[in-house]
Amino acid sequence: MFGPSPPCRSLSGRISLNFVSRVGTLLAEHPHIVAPSLSSLGLSTERPLVLVDVDEVLGLFMQGFGDFLVGHGLEMRIDRFALFQNIYRPGASEHLEVAEGRKLFDAFFAGHCHEIEPAPGGIEALIRLAKSAEILILSNAPAEAERLRTQWLRQHGLPHPLILNSGPKGPIAAGLVAQTAQKSAFVDDLLPNLDSVKDHSPATATFQHVADLRLRPFAPTSERHPRIDDWAELADAIEAAIRS
């Protein structure tokens, strides 16, 4: 989703956090550095690999963050495809200062990101896809979100490893995909991330999904990446893309 990007970290229950700390940043600065090994994350290289975002893909971030803002006397107005520029004081004509929005963003992820609702059909689709593919959750979120984001995944029946990335997702996605000869797919709501993955890993099938109904009319699209906002249809498309 929108907002600042933290250092890359992984929470899989199978690998030391120190091993993957700052991997995303290092990959961006030093392209020769490899991503965490799939085996160390508990993933097989003998099955297709599906990389999936969380905010506005698996989870309704804008809805949850909006509820959080109400508790702070603010409101979220969805009138553009943006984050901080949609935060207002009630009755105000100008959005909240971005610096203040960032503080609230960090506070939300530090203490409330596990409260977001799942995107309709997303959990069921991942459970279905996991029968024939390896699933890895690749999310740009502050480092403070590690524990609660993993808790959110587990409470919804998703045991898959989580990597918190920094910046564009192409470098780390390419490093992960390069470890398997099987087909791969990537799902995100943001075109910069989708373009980054397609640029770094052209063979990876990329799909755009925007979960929040209010955001969909404002979300830019690209012919490079099929836009599929229904998770059942998206799961069909992913299965077709990774089928041997």
Question: Where are the regions that the model predicts?
Answer:
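Glycine-rich phosphate-binding loop signature in dinucleotide/nucleotide-binding domains
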Residues: S44-T45, K131-S132, V177-K183
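Metal-dependent phosphoesterase signature
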Residues: Y88-G121
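Acidic, Mg2+-coordinating phosphoryl-transfer loop and its flanking beta/alpha structural elements
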Residues: F186-D229
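Short, charged, surface-exposed secondary-structure boundary motifs
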Residues: P171-G175, L215-E223, A237-E239
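Short acidic-hydrophobic, aromatic-tinged amphipathic segments that line or gate anion-handling sites
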Residues: P161-G167, R224-E233
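Substrate-recognition "cap/lid" segment bordering the active-site pocket of phosphatases
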Residues: P142-A185, P192-K198
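Substrate-recognition element of Asp-dependent hydrolases with the DxDx(T/V) motif
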Residues: C113, E117-P118, G122-W152, I163-N165
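Active-site neighborhood of HAD-like aspartate-dependent phosphohydrolases
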Residues: I15-E100
